[in-house]
């Protein structure tokens, strides 16, 4: 007759037989699919044992993937592109075969700066264009009065945060390189820096915006989803040679994360997900605060009422986990726009190939799930939820608009860059 000891021995033997993967993450709500894959057994069901290692900065994440400390990592969407192109660090080919979701960031200002914006006409219900106009008046007033320029923090130079902040400022006719000061801080340092007046605002993922509000230090002015509805954010990053050495492990991890993201995206699971993420090993933050991001019911300022933000953070719906190559090329376009990278068709192609929909499709081919037919799309073209071509004919994408109405056609990259005044040399290769 089996005993409890026999059951324990069998479980231990099973754990020893699992392929072990070490994966780094930053404590943000959008790391949820990784945590769920481990805690809810989706990884074990794919014969994987996940060791999740919490890091404090994105630079550490990148470096530890580069040198092989991590097999993979929760990574900023532009980061594997920059590493592959050798921009800002040693050239290390990387791939991104999975997206952790869409949205999840916000731009928060100190209470005192937001008061200046209110005096310039800002109101909580305003869209990003009008909010930007109020900020432009504050920037102009400070300049005319001889006051220091605003200091705004982002999490890394090669981040969606940096690019969406710059995009918003530029639409408001604020020069991000001349009229404000943009600095880099780890996400976990943002709230203290804002409270201590070392910075005037930041763009970061949750729960840090809501924690700033809860501390009375900040006011959420703009969300990523209002700047680019269903815009890309974090990816699963690997060194390119991992896929060559361990293709089955990579595919197994993609399947586990797909199922975990599907679970995390269900509203009925959000209370449990909030409790899981709140644990000291993960976000070490109150479950109630985490729940704001999960539900999209954000409190913008201290004492304010919750406000539902559509598509604030999307874990699974709308092909949120698919690594669209148009996302990769948009990130590259911003590197070029802001002087981080030169433009050439060869570099654009290299950037495009960092995102790997072929590996995503291959991992999920036998599951029967619906998959997009295309690997890239015109970003910003869908004004409403729209059926698109897919394997099972049941996929809905969008809306995915940019707040200024622009479109990004990945096949017209040069024209897109020129529309921002970027000079491209004739015959760039």
How would you describe each model-predicted region?
Residues 161-164, 186, 190, 204, ...:
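Internal, well-ordered alpha-helical segments in soluble enzyme and binding-protein domains
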Residues 2-10, 14-177, 200-213, 217-230:
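Short, glycine-/small- and polar/acidic-enriched structural segments
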Residues 70, 199, 258-262:
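Solvent-exposed alpha-helix faces
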Residues 71, 180, 184-220, 239, ...:
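Ligand-binding pocket segment of bilobal, Venus flytrap-like solute-binding proteins
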Residues 248-361:
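Secondary-structure end/capping motifs
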Residues 329-429:
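Conserved C-terminal helix/tail region of periplasmic/extracytoplasmic solute-binding proteins
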Residues 41-44, 111-129, 233-287:
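Extended ligand-binding regions for polar small-molecule ligands
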